[in-house]
Amino acid sequence: MPTTHDWINNPLGVVDGLFAQSNSSPDWEKKVVEYFKEKLKLNDAHTWVPSLNDVPLHYLKPNSLVKFRCMVQDMFDPEFFMGVYEMNDPTSNSKQVKCGKYKDVTECGQVDFNSRNTVTSERQTFYCVPIPGESNWVKESYAGTSQARVVPSTSYVPNRHKRSYEEDDEMDTQCQQTKDISQGAQSSSESHGNTEPKRQETEAPSQDSSSSHCTSSLDLNFPLPGEKGPACLVKVYEDWDSFKLNDMLEVFGILSVDPALSVIADEREASSLLDPTEGMETMEEQRVHSPPASLVPRLHMLYAQPLAHNNPLLPSSPLENNADYLSCVLGELASVRAELLTFFTHILMGDSLAAEFLILHLISNVYSRRDVLPLGKFTLNLSGCPLSSPFTEHLFKVIQQLVPSSYRLSMSLHNMNTQRMVPRKDYTANRLVSGTLQLAKNTSLFLDETQLEQGQLDSTGVRNITALGNLISWQKVDYDFNYHQMEFPCNINVLIASEGRSLLPSDCQVHLRASLNPPNLEEYLSAVQVAQVPSQLNKYRVYLSVARALNYTISDEITKAVEEDFVDMRKDDPQSMSAEDLHRLLVVARLLSLSHGQNTLSRDGWMKAKQLEALRISRTQQQKCVNGNEP
C-alpha cells in the first residue's frame, strides 16, 4: 500500500494501482474517491495538502494532490475523454490497458484506437476563481494553518512555462505523445452509440510552438476589479449536478500543468478535421476554454467539500455537529457582544443605537425563501454619514477586518455608468462574463452612496441601479443571457452608507447621531482600529459567524403573544403598525435573540426588540422634521 505521503505526492500512482487491482470492475472509481476521502479524514490530513490559494504554482509538483478554496464562476459544456485505453509497447511488443481518468494527456506510447477495451467517458469542467472579496486575515489564517511541505518544482518553473509554449526545441527530443486521442475517443464514442454533439478534448500536445497565448492578454474573469490569485479549470467526474454556479468549494484534486495544455487550442485548429465538433469552436472560445496551463492550471477533482462559510477560525463542518465547540463559544458570547458593541459605538462616533443595528445587520442571513420572498435579509441604510470625510472608508475597513468576504462599491457616477455589475453570457467565447454582483454567499457588500455626485445616469447606470435594487429587495441577480434573463438567488449582506435617505431600498434606516466630535476624524478612527489586538478581533470574527449560523425557532406561546400584541397596537392606532412593520419587527427580534446567543424568542427578547425599533423610528421621524423635504 502507498506510504504516508505517496497519496499526496503521487496520487496517480494510487489511482493506477487501484485500477490495476480492479480487473475491469466498475467499482474501482468509487474506491478511488473513498480512498482519498478516508485519507483526508485522518487527524489534520487536509492541512498536509498544499493549497493553490497560498502556494505559487511553480512550487507545486505536477500531478500531485493539491486543494483550492474557490467559487464556481462558470460551468463549461461537458466533454468526452478516454477513460480506459490500450497502449502498444513497441519495445516489448506487448499491450497494456491504461486508465485515462484524472489525466489530460496519454503516456508515451502508441494508443490502439481499435481496441475493444477502449472506454469513452464524460466529465464536466468548472471555471473556478478564488472567493471574491476574501479578506486578507482569512487568507493569512488559512495559510498559517498549513502543514504542507512544499519545495520548488525542478520540472516546472516560470521560465519553463514560457519556453514550453514559445520556443522549446526540447519537445522534439521528448517522447511522442499521442496526437490522435480525440479521434480515438470520437470513434470510440460512436461505437458506444454516443451521438450527442458535445465538445471533445483533443488532449494532444503540439511540437510546433506558438506565442499566441502569451502575447494576447488573458482575462481571468474575476468578478471584482483588482482581484488577484489563481483561476482553475476543475475537471469534475462524478455528481456534477450537485454543484451550482457561485458555490463555495474546497476542491481536492490532481494538479495538471503539462506544457502540452498550453497549445491545445492551436493543435485543435490544425486537427479540426479529426473531429467536426472542434471546427465549431471559435478562436475566442478556444482561447477561453484552453488557456495556458501556467496561468490557468487544470485540477482533476477527487473530492470537493461545499463550504458553509470561509471563516478559518470555525470548524468547517456544521455547528450542530460540534457541540463542545459551540458550547464553549456560547459561554463567552455575552461578553464578546458587549465588547463588540463598545467597539462599534466608538467607530460610529458614540452612537450606540446605530452600533446595535450594525451588529444585527452583520449577523443577518437569508435562512429560507417563501415563494419569491427571501426570509432573514436585513439591509441596513446608515444615513447621516458625513460627505468628503474618511468616515465611510474607515467604516468599511472595520467591517473588512471582521467578516470573511466583503467589497466596497463606491457609487460614483463614473462607476455606476461604466462598471459591469450583472454577469452576461458571451456566446462568441461561450463563457459567462463575470460582474461585480457575482458574489459568494454571506459576502458583505458596502455601498458608499456618499460618493454619488450630481449628473446623469446613462442606460448602463440605470441597469446597475435596478440590479442593486433587485439584489436588496429580492436577494437575486438577473444574469444577462442576451435573449432572456435568468434569476440567480443570492445571500448578500448589503450596507448602504449615505448622507440622506438612500435612493436604494433598504429593510432598515438608521440615521447616524454622533455624540463625539473629534478634531481629527481620521486620526481618531485609526486609533480606535489600532487599539483592537488580533486576539480580540478573532473573538469578534468568531462571534459574528457563529451568531449568523445559529438555528432559530419561535414557540407557539410566543407566536400567540406576538399576534395579540399586534392586534392591540392596531387598536390603539391603525396607522402605527402595518404588516410590513410587523415583519421588520420580527426580523429585528430574531436577530436580537441570535446576537445574544439565544436560538428562540422570549417575551423579554420581544420587548427589547420593540424598544429598539421604537427608538429607531423616533429618531428617523425627528430627522424627517429637521430635513423637511426628506421622503
Curated annotation (Swiss-Prot):
Segments of skewed composition (Low complexity): 206-217
Q: Which InterPro entries match?
A: MCM_complex-bd
What Pfam families does its record include?
MCM_bind
What would you give as a GO molecular function for this chain, any one? chromatin binding
UniProt main location, coarse: nucleus
Q: Which UniProt keywords apply?
A: Cell cycle, Cell division, DNA replication, Mitosis, Nucleus
**Biological process GO terms, please?**
cell division; DNA-templated DNA replication; sister chromatid cohesion
Where do the record's region annotations for Disordered lie? 148-218
Q: Which GO terms describe its cellular component?
A: nucleus
Tell me where in or outside the cell this protein is found: Nucleus
Residues folding into a coiled coil are: none
Which residue stretches does the UniProt record annotate as biased composition, category Basic and acidic residues?
Answer: 193-202
Biased amino acid composition, Polar residues:
148-157, 173-192
> Does this entry carry the keyword DNA repair?
no
The protein's job, in short, is:
Associated component of the mcm complex that acts as a regulator of DNA replication. Binds to the MCM complex during late S phase and promotes the disassembly of the mcm complex from chromatin, thereby acting as a key regulator of pre-replication complex (pre-RC) unloading from replicated DNA. Can dissociate the mcm complex without addition of ATP; probably acts by destabilizing interactions of each individual subunits of the mcm complex. Required for sister chromatid cohesion.
Q: Which family does it belong to?
A: Belongs to the MCMBP family.
Q: How does it assemble?
A: Interacts with the mcm complex: associates with the mcm3-7 complex which lacks mcm2, while it does not interact with the mcm complex when mcm2 is present (mcm2-7 complex).
Q: What is this protein called?
A: Mini-chromosome maintenance complex-binding protein
Please report the organism this UniProt entry assigns to the protein: Danio rerio
Question: Could you read off the lineage of the organism from its UniProt record?
Answer: Eukaryota, Metazoa, Chordata, Craniata, Vertebrata
